[in-house]
Amino acid sequence: ALCVGLAALFATDADALVVTGATSVGPEDLMPRLLSGTGSLDLHGLAVRPASPTGLGRAPDGRPVLLLPGNPVSCLCAYELLVGPLLRALGGRPDPWSFPHRVVDRELARKLTSKVGRTDFVRVRLDDDGRAVPLATSGASNLSSTVVADGFVLVDADSEGAAPGERVRVHLFDDRP
């Protein structure tokens, strides 16, 4: 069924192809193998939490194919970091890699922890004092933390996080203050 679906996807006239789910490394995660067997799989696995099972390749005709994780928060993160910029570039945007979100500088309400060696996409909400409150970072399928989030903070791969009171750049999901 996935082979038929992938063939149908390749038959479209879309400029880029985006697939969600079945992108990790388990026996049921067939998309990376299918793509490498029919087109090319140029990148699989990112040092980003929670989007690590993301992949990037090409259809047989050279069009970009993005493999996004099936977990909702992982998929959102992969979209923000790869799909959005790719679509903006294909659309002719002059600076496609900049995030389209309004960015605000906020004080952290509590400790934000991260692991050196990977970039973390941390959902945050803004409290009544305007401080950034890190939300649950475990569980890529933890959609509830994203639903209540006002935005996200990207923690660089060389950082262990930030202490309460430190200032962070919050990428807002919408135009609320």
Residue ranges of each PLM-predicted region?
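N-terminal small/polar loop signature for handling phosphorylated ligands or for N-terminal nucleophile
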Residues: 1-37
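Flexible glycine/proline-rich
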Residues: 34-177
